[in-house]
């Protein structure tokens, strides 16, 4: 751990010393400060006080690297304000003026070498640095917010005094400025409104065209559906008529076949009857011939007997 001595006034020590302002010392300790700033070089001294701290490096290059790397960093909820102790920042605030470290250290003698009683030397160093910080900044670490801007008071019409002409002129100027700004803002708003209206009209036209196209598509689809239904009904009717015709033809053909079959049967019956009659006649003729033959035989036998 580095020593607590950070108040040497020789130029080399002052140029290699880093001031750390706006430090939350309720949370951040000396070991934390050394751990953060030791990465930029060897630390030979480190002192932490109420709201600020000092880090003493061996050379100026390490100190400048630490300022460049850690200035503006947020630690424990507060943004650090870091700079070289010999080169304070110029525009740190309006309420106070920052003095150079050389002026602050000029009339203060250097502390003697650290004695075995470290507590006494630490107390002296702490008091010296606190006095340095208090005199260096005559304003609080956190600048209070600016007061609210008061509205311009408009003088009444009854107060017509020559001594208030300058005030009236100022108020008039403020009014004119406000009116000019309001007119500009009104013009800007009017232009914006016109542009918005144009965009809305374009969008409306596009939407209307889309709706019209959708309606056309729906109408075409409905027409196509009706045509398809009509075609289907016509096809069904034609198919049904064809089926009816086919059935009629079949019925007629079947009826003709039946008639022809009946006629054929009748003809067959007639032929059969004719054939039967012929056969009967032949049989009768055969019987007659046989009887005549027998008679002839009988007559021949009688003649022989006589």
Curated annotation (Swiss-Prot):
Q: Which GO terms describe its molecular function?
A: N6-methyladenosine-containing RNA reader activity; RNA binding
Stretches of Basic and acidic residues bias are at 220-232, 242-253, 277-287
Glycyl lysine isopeptide (Lys-Gly) (interchain with G-Cter in SUMO1), cross-linked positions: 232
At what positions is Phosphoserine found? 113, 115, 121, 162, 166, 233, 238-239, 241, 253, 260, 299, 306
Residue ranges annotated as coiled coil are 190-224
Q: Where is this cross-link: Glycyl lysine isopeptide (Lys-Gly) (interchain with G-Cter in SUMO)?
A: 250
Q: Which parts of the sequence are annotated with region: Disordered?
A: 139-190, 220-306
Q: Where is the composition biased (Acidic residues)?
A: 255-276, 288-306
Q: What is its main location?
A: nucleus
CDD domains recorded for this chain?
A: RRM_hnRNPC
Share the record's PTM remark. Answer: Phosphorylated on Ser-260 and Ser-299 in resting cells. Sumoylated. Sumoylation reduces affinity for mRNA.
| Modified residue annotations for N-acetylalanine | 2
Q: Give the family per the record.
A: Belongs to the RRM HNRPC family. RALY subfamily.
Q: How does it assemble?
A: Tetramer composed of 3 copies of isoform C1 and 1 copy of isoform C2. Assembly of 3 tetramers with bound pre-mRNA gives rise to a 19S complex that interacts with HNRNPA2B1 tetramers. Component of the 40S hnRNP particle. Identified in the spliceosome C complex. Interacts with IGF2BP1. Interacts with PPIA/CYPA.
According to UniProt, the name of this protein is Heterogeneous nuclear ribonucleoprotein C
What organism is the protein native to? Answer: Oryctolagus cuniculus
Organism lineage: Eukaryota, Metazoa, Chordata, Craniata, Vertebrata
